[in-house]
Amino acid sequence: MPTYKAVIAYDGSVFSGFALQKDKRLKSVLGTLKEGFARVGIKSDIIGAGRTDKGVHATGQVICFQSAHFLDSQVQAIESLRFLLNAKLYPHIMVRSLHIVDDTFHPRFDALWRSYRFLLSPTQPSPFAAPYVSYEKIGDETLFKNALQAFQGQHNFVFFKKNGSYTKNCIRTIFAIKHYTYKGLDIVYVRGNGFLRAQVRLMVGAALAYSRAELSFHSLQEQINGQKQHYTYPISPNGLYLCEVGYR
């Protein structure tokens, strides 16, 4: 039975996160995928590259599943399957690409890096844009950029994870992080080998606090070094997007 790798996009504002929720009344990305796939006869397990939190979007989440219904590896047959899946997942989830991969492929454990973009609006967005950007004003832009660069490299991010979330190893490596502007928005791009729960929201929030003189650079460094927690507020997830997962 062939294994499929799919790159998907979804609107996180309508979901309570990627993972299945204990409260069955809450809508999850994975639950919606399972329902949509079942409607075309696919009842395989679906494995994701990561679990995005409530309100976090994705333009490049990676999942894998198996299906015996479409054994033909020809491009036309795979595109037909993608079309069928998108018809069932519309309007909040889209399968952007679909390929047959080796049966040993695992979207989470085989991933070398993941990247996120955070869209920040310095002005209050309209009700139509509000679910897709975070309303945050940068103080001093130079200070903000300096704070972001302090995260680059390998650190113990024990104080950059959501309270109550357990992780055995909090060591993570940030390969790249930068700030730029596009069409009136401040955008933070970050790429790392993995992220703790709410880590990106806490990182950007701490950098914003430093740019506004609400947090000293010494305190920021103490927190990055895993010595002491000073900043504790994860900013709104509205503008956060999982944009790519990298493999060999």
UniProtKB/Swiss-Prot annotation:
**Signal sequence bounds:** none
Question: What GO molecular function terms would the record report?
Answer: RNA binding; tRNA pseudouridine(38-40) synthase activity
Catalytic site: 53 (nucleophile)
Any one Pfam family match given in the protein's UniProt record, by short name = PseudoU_synth_1
Which SUPFAM superfamilies does this chain map to?
Pseudouridine synthase
For this entry, list what GO says about its biological process.
tRNA pseudouridine synthesis
Which Enzyme Commission numbers does its entry carry? 5.4.99.12
- Reactions mediated catalytically: uridine(38/39/40) in tRNA = pseudouridine(38/39/40) in tRNA
Q: Which domain of life is it from?
A: Bacteria
Record keywords: Isomerase, tRNA processing
Say if the entry is tagged with keyword Ribonucleoprotein.
Answer: no
Which amino acids does the record list as binding substrate? 116
Which NCBIfam families does the UniProt entry name for this protein?
Answer: hisT_truA (TIGR00071)
PANTHER family tied to this protein: PSEUDOURIDYLATE SYNTHASE, TRNA PSEUDOURIDINE SYNTHASE-LIKE 1
Q: What is stated as this protein's family in its record? A: Belongs to the tRNA pseudouridine synthase TruA family.
The record's subunit annotation is: Homodimer.
* Its biological purpose: Formation of pseudouridine at positions 38, 39 and 40 in the anticodon stem and loop of transfer RNAs.
Name of the protein in its database record = tRNA pseudouridine synthase A
Record organism = Helicobacter hepaticus (strain ATCC 51449 / 3B1)
